[in-house]
Amino acid sequence: MEKNNEVIQTHPLVGWDISTVDSYDALMLRLHYQTPNKSEQEGTEVGQTLWLTTDVARQFISILEAGIAKIESGDFQVNEYRRH
């Protein structure tokens, strides 16, 4: 298990590619993110292609919506964001 004081490196999300794979009832997703210490044009990376079933995609959407609602409500601890 990781230590609580360990720093997690994060990268700002700047875009994505999403397409459907109708024959498998699935979606393919690639995230584009900014690499630190590089210019915007040089530093944009494209992550691996992810395969999401419709059930997993719905769960992902639900988790994102819950996170957005929590942030917008102001119902969070200040220390949650200082670690990043």
From Swiss-Prot:
Pfam families: BssS
Function of the molecule: Represses biofilm formation in M9C glu and LB glu media but not in M9C and LB media. Seems to act as a global regulator of several genes involved in catabolite repression and stress response and regulation of the uptake and export of signaling pathways. Could be involved the regulation of indole as well as uptake and export of AI-2 through a cAMP-dependent pathway.
Protein name in the entry: Biofilm regulator BssS
Induction pattern: After 3 hrs of cold shock.
Effect of disrupting the coding gene: Cells show increased biofilm formation when glucose is present in the medium. In a continuous-flow system with M9C medium supplemented with glucose, the biofilm had a 240-fold greater biomass, a 2800 fold-greater average thickness and a 16-fold increased surface coverage than the wild-type.
InterPro entries in alphabetical order: Biofilm_BssS
GO biological process entries: regulation of single-species biofilm formation; single-species submerged biofilm formation
Organism expressing this protein natively: Escherichia coli (strain K12)
NCBIfam families xrefs: PRK12301.1 (NF008958)
